[in-house]
């Protein structure tokens, strides 16, 4: 089998690894600008919560007229705020179903370009909401930016995974998550009262998401389309060859094109799949279950509960400056994503995911103990900060970055878009459930709420240990072929997953 455009043959017979070209860097950077916006809009709603609620109150009172109540009912305000947070996920849930259709119709690059229409509209609506005295406009803007993020969550990993060299696919795939966490951190810093988190400037804070959208619109036209899409899906050999030359920096891409031809021949029996075809396929049942459970492990870990409500969590823990503690969590978030970038090709996807889940489970238990003892032991406020920081750090080691790009690795070209849609919908559905329901569950369970996440994390750890294979260093064709040789998840005996069991020996061994 040709070693692929990830490794291009040399005269001495030893296939050198593809170098990192300027075009590859530009393409990855331009793509992950979408992920930056995704993260920004996760974090931007947190710090200015109080001033936005004051705006909601003023808007509501203005509609009541003279002789009305003095303030908005607390239940109404809680519902409006929860809706403002969770509607973002509703937009993502709906648009994630369109990932496969749009990516096949427009191509990966043009789909990302067209998606920016939603970002510009959503940002503009959120920026104008206060001037229009309408929380409905803000909620609509959050819905549109959520729809943008839903498409981004599938399009970016798909594009980056298809243009990345095999030996860098994990590291470059992790940059998607790095951009998300940088976006969260930027939003948290700009949301401080000393920055844009004020009663007059918060609309600008929400509208700033337009800037990376405009930058992406400028840069993406200079980037190549995915050569896998061009050749395997569109059968355009000339444009695919040109794209390969730009990405690899090699004048002769015959070996690279040979791999695509070989993959295309094998996929002639595996045409692009619809959602219904994928869901009914026995061949793809096992990787689909793994993909969905990995997405659930990310969202039901409790991480978005921490990000959405981190300020209020730190307040309940007795932290004097909760907004700054939240930013500290954002810094930890970013630093440990960088750690994951460095480790993912050395330690492997499965190992990092297991480590992250185990660490998060321990931190969730520690957080529960700290919150329970807070009234009797004031120093527990510092323990709670350490627990949250540890929770975030372990998330970014594994459950944060791994699920997004491993879906693209588990599937061949035919079912990949539909699989990304299923995985994306699963992720966004859980995001919505956590965003809408966490505050109510936290009110009911108090400090014990993170024990619920600890139990879920333990379950995901067991599943990953038993069923998730290692994909490091494998081509897409090798991974999909291994699943075709392996019995369905429902038919296997329960035993630990190993790289050798699923993927066979390393071709270099």
Swiss-Prot record:
<feature type="topological domain" description="Extracellular">
    <location>
        <begin position="374"/>
        <end position="384"/>
    </location>
</feature>
<feature type="transmembrane region" description="Helical; Name=3">
    <location>
        <begin position="111"/>
        <end position="131"/>
    </location>
</feature>
<dbReference type="GO" id="GO:0070062">
    <property type="term" value="C:extracellular exosome"/>
</dbReference>
<dbReference type="GO" id="GO:0005768">
    <property type="term" value="C:endosome"/>
</dbReference>
<feature type="binding site">
    <location>
        <begin position="298"/>
        <end position="299"/>
    </location>
    <ligand>
        <name>D-glucose</name>
    </ligand>
</feature>
<keyword id="KW-0325">Glycoprotein</keyword>
<dbReference type="GO" id="GO:0042593">
    <property type="term" value="P:glucose homeostasis"/>
</dbReference>
<keyword id="KW-0963">Cytoplasm</keyword>
<feature type="transmembrane region" description="Helical; Name=9">
    <location>
        <begin position="353"/>
        <end position="373"/>
    </location>
</feature>
<dbReference type="GO" id="GO:0031550">
    <property type="term" value="P:positive regulation of brain-derived neurotrophic factor receptor signaling pathway"/>
</dbReference>
<dbReference type="InterPro" id="IPR045263">
    <property type="entry name" value="GLUT"/>
</dbReference>
<dbReference type="GO" id="GO:0071456">
    <property type="term" value="P:cellular response to hypoxia"/>
</dbReference>
<dbReference type="GO" id="GO:0012506">
    <property type="term" value="C:vesicle membrane"/>
</dbReference>
<feature type="binding site">
    <location>
        <position position="396"/>
    </location>
    <ligand>
        <name>D-glucose</name>
    </ligand>
</feature>
<dbReference type="GO" id="GO:0030659">
    <property type="term" value="C:cytoplasmic vesicle membrane"/>
</dbReference>
<comment type="subunit">
    <text>Binds to DAXX. Interacts via its N-terminus with SRFBP1. Interacts with NDUFA9. Interacts with TRARG1; the interaction is required for proper SLC2A4 recycling after insulin stimulation.</text>
</comment>
<feature type="modified residue" description="Phosphoserine; by SGK1">
    <location>
        <position position="274"/>
    </location>
</feature>
<dbReference type="GO" id="GO:0007614">
    <property type="term" value="P:short-term memory"/>
</dbReference>
<keyword id="KW-0813">Transport</keyword>
<feature type="binding site">
    <location>
        <position position="333"/>
    </location>
    <ligand>
        <name>D-glucose</name>
    </ligand>
</feature>
<keyword id="KW-1003">Cell membrane</keyword>
<dbReference type="GO" id="GO:0032869">
    <property type="term" value="P:cellular response to insulin stimulus"/>
</dbReference>
<keyword id="KW-0597">Phosphoprotein</keyword>
<feature type="topological domain" description="Cytoplasmic">
    <location>
        <begin position="1"/>
        <end position="23"/>
    </location>
</feature>
<feature type="region of interest" description="Interaction with SRFBP1">
    <location>
        <begin position="7"/>
        <end position="13"/>
    </location>
</feature>
<dbReference type="InterPro" id="IPR036259">
    <property type="entry name" value="MFS_trans_sf"/>
</dbReference>
<dbReference type="GO" id="GO:0015304">
    <property type="term" value="F:D-glucose uniporter activity"/>
</dbReference>
<dbReference type="GO" id="GO:0045471">
    <property type="term" value="P:response to ethanol"/>
</dbReference>
<feature type="glycosylation site" description="N-linked (GlcNAc...) asparagine">
    <location>
        <position position="57"/>
    </location>
</feature>
<dbReference type="GO" id="GO:0048471">
    <property type="term" value="C:perinuclear region of cytoplasm"/>
</dbReference>
<feature type="transmembrane region" description="Helical; Name=10">
    <location>
        <begin position="385"/>
        <end position="405"/>
    </location>
</feature>
<dbReference type="GO" id="GO:0005360">
    <property type="term" value="F:insulin-responsive D-glucose:proton symporter activity"/>
</dbReference>
<feature type="topological domain" description="Cytoplasmic">
    <location>
        <begin position="163"/>
        <end position="170"/>
    </location>
</feature>
<dbReference type="GO" id="GO:0055056">
    <property type="term" value="F:D-glucose transmembrane transporter activity"/>
</dbReference>
<dbReference type="GO" id="GO:0071356">
    <property type="term" value="P:cellular response to tumor necrosis factor"/>
</dbReference>
<dbReference type="GO" id="GO:0005771">
    <property type="term" value="C:multivesicular body"/>
</dbReference>
<feature type="transmembrane region" description="Helical; Name=12">
    <location>
        <begin position="445"/>
        <end position="465"/>
    </location>
</feature>
<feature type="transmembrane region" description="Helical; Name=2">
    <location>
        <begin position="81"/>
        <end position="101"/>
    </location>
</feature>
<dbReference type="GO" id="GO:0050873">
    <property type="term" value="P:brown fat cell differentiation"/>
</dbReference>
<dbReference type="GO" id="GO:0007616">
    <property type="term" value="P:long-term memory"/>
</dbReference>
<feature type="binding site">
    <location>
        <position position="404"/>
    </location>
    <ligand>
        <name>D-glucose</name>
    </ligand>
</feature>
<dbReference type="GO" id="GO:0012505">
    <property type="term" value="C:endomembrane system"/>
</dbReference>
């Amino acid at each position: 089998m040709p070693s692929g455009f990830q490794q291009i043959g040399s005269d001495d017979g030893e296939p050198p690894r593809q170098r990192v070209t300027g075009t590859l860097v530009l393409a990855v950077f331009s793509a992950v600008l979408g992920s930056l916006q995704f993260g920004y809009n996760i974090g931007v709603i947190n710090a200015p919560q109080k001033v936005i609620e004051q705006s909601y109150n003023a808007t509501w009172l203005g509609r009541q007229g003279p002789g009305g109540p003095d303030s908005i009912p607390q239940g109404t305000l809680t519902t409006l705020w929860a809706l403002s947070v969770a509607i973002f996920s509703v937009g993502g849930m709906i648009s994630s179903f369109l990932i496969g259709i749009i990516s096949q119709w427009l191509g990966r690059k043009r789909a990302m370009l067209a998606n920016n229409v939603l970002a510009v509209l959503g940002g503009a609506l959120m920026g104008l909401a206060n001037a229009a005295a309408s929380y409905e406009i803000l909620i609509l803007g959050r819905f549109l930016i959520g729809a943008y993020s839903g498409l981004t969550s599938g399009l970016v990993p798909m594009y980056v995974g298809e243009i990345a060299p095999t030996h860098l696919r994990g590291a470059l795939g992790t940059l998607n998550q790095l951009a998300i966490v940088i976006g969260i951190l930027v939003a948290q810093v700009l949301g401080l009262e000393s920055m844009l988190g004020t009663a007059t400037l918060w609309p600008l804070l929400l509208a700033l998401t337009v800037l990376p959208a405009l930058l992406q619109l400028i840069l993406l036209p200079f980037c190549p389309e995915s050569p896998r899409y061009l050749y395997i899906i569109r059968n355009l050999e000339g444009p695919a060859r040109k794209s390969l030359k730009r990405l690899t920096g090699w004048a002769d891409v015959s070996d690279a094109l040979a791999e695509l031809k070989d993959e295309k021949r094998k996929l002639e029996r595996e045409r692009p799949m619809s959602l219904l075809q994928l869901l009914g396929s026995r061949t793809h049942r096992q990787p689909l279950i793994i993909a969905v459970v990995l997405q659930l492990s990310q969202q039901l870990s409790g991480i978005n509960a921490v990000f959405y409500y981190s300020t209020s969590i730190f307040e309940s823990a007795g932290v004097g400056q909760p907004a700054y503690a939240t930013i500290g969590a954002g810094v930890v978030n970013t630093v440990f994503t960088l750690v994951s970038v460095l480790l993912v090709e050395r330690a492997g996807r499965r190992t990092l995911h297991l480590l992250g889940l185990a660490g998060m489970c321990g931190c969730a238990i520690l957080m529960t103990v700290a919150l329970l003892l807070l009234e009797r032991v004031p120093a527990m406020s510092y323990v709670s900060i350490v627990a949250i920081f540890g929770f975030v750090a372990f998330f970014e080691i594994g459950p944060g970055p791994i699920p997004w790009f491993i879906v693209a690795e588990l599937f061949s070209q035919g079912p990949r878009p539909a699989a990304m849609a299923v995985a994306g919908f699963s992720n966004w559905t859980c995001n919505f459930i956590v965003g809408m329901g966490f505050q109510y569950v936290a009110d009911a369970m108090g400090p014990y709420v993170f024990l619920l996440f600890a139990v879920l994390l333990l379950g995901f750890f067991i599943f990953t240990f038993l069923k998730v294979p290692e994909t490091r260093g494998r081509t897409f064709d090798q991974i999909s072929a291994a699943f075709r040789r392996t019995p369905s998840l429902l038919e296997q005996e329960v035993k630990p997953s190993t790289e050798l069991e699923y993927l066979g020996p390393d071709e270099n061994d």
